[in-house]
């Protein structure tokens, strides 16, 4: 449960440029293509599950909502520090009564009388990176709007933000996972992401972009488990025979290798198709945001 180690390694990853692989160069990132970012996700996941989770939560849903939906001012203000690892991002969507039904969240955002800021109040749970995040992407409902709205919220304990204890998880013990409580947290109106009521769209599209990268993050673990299984089967003996020579073990290892190959093929075939569609849209004059979102949208089922 060494959360500080995860934070330190993440900061080092930022210094090496890994936290900005998906971020355009004009905002301090490397501007890599979709396939290259998938390869980085797979590579990083080979360290630990905790680092993989922290990395994915930061580079994906903790950063990309601003890259894809933020104003030019928001991107210039927040994205370079997120890409460098100076700041870390976290994504506050899930609530005690709003999981898969994300648009049913009860967190409220109330506009001040002078129209300069919103006061956000509510409870978020299972928030990855919450223990060391500097920036929260928060979703809240304004008045009785049908859909939630997204906000960029700096983590400031003096502004009504408190954290729950670290969750006692079955695995990924060094990945910070906490509840986040907002109590009349004041957020400037200029920190609204996109438009009022556009939060559910932002939330779902951000998850669409991140979902296939999560699959890539699982590939290295599949390969490592298969390799370890083969090694063990060649070492372990029963009935004076290495168990690798038993047909049942051969079948099991063959299935593991097949599953790894199929998963890898599906991930990189889909990611190359997405990259091709993004490039076509770029050449057609689409912005980075539109090209990225529309490219992923065309393969959302595969993702």
Where are these regions (language model features)?
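Long, acidic (Asp/Glu-rich), low-complexity accessory segments flanking structured domains
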Residues: 184-202
């Amino acid at each position: 449960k060494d959360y500080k180690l995860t934070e330190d390694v993440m900061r080092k990853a930022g210094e090496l440029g890994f936290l900005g692989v998906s971020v355009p160069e004009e905002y301090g990132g490397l501007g890599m293509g979709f396939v290259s970012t998938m390869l980085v996700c797979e590579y990083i996941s080979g360290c630990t599950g905790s680092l993989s989770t922290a990395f994915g939560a930061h580079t994906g849903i903790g950063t990309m909502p601003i890259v894809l939906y933020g104003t030019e001012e928001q991107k210039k203000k927040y994205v370079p520090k997120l890409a460098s690892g100076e700041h870390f991002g976290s994504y506050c969507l899930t609530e005690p009564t709003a999981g898969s039904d994300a648009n049913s969240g009860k967190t409220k955002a109330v506009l001040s009388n002078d129209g300069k800021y919103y006061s956000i109040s509510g409870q978020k749970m299972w928030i990855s990176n919450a223990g060391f995040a500097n920036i929260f992407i928060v979703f809240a409902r304004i008045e009785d709007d049908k859909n939630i709205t997204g906000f960029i919220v700096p983590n400031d304990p003096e502004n009504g933000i408190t954290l729950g204890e670290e969750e006692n998880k079955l695995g990924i013990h060094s990945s910070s996972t906490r509840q986040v409580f907002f109590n009349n947290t004041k957020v400037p109106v200029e920190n609204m992401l996109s438009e009022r009521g556009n939060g559910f769209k932002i939330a779902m599209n951000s998850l669409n972009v991140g979902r296939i990268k999560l699959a890539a993050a699982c590939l290295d673990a599949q390969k490592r488990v298969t390799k370890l299984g083969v090694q063990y089967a060649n070492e372990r003996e029963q009935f004076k025979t290495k168990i690798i020579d038993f047909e049942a073990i051969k079948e099991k290892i063959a299935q593991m290798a097949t599953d790894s190959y199929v998963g890898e093929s599906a991930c990189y075939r889909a990611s190359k198709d997405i990259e091709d569609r993004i490039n076509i849209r770029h050449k057609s004059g689409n912005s980075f945001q539109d090209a990225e979102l529309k490219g992923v949208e065309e393969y959302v089922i595969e993702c």
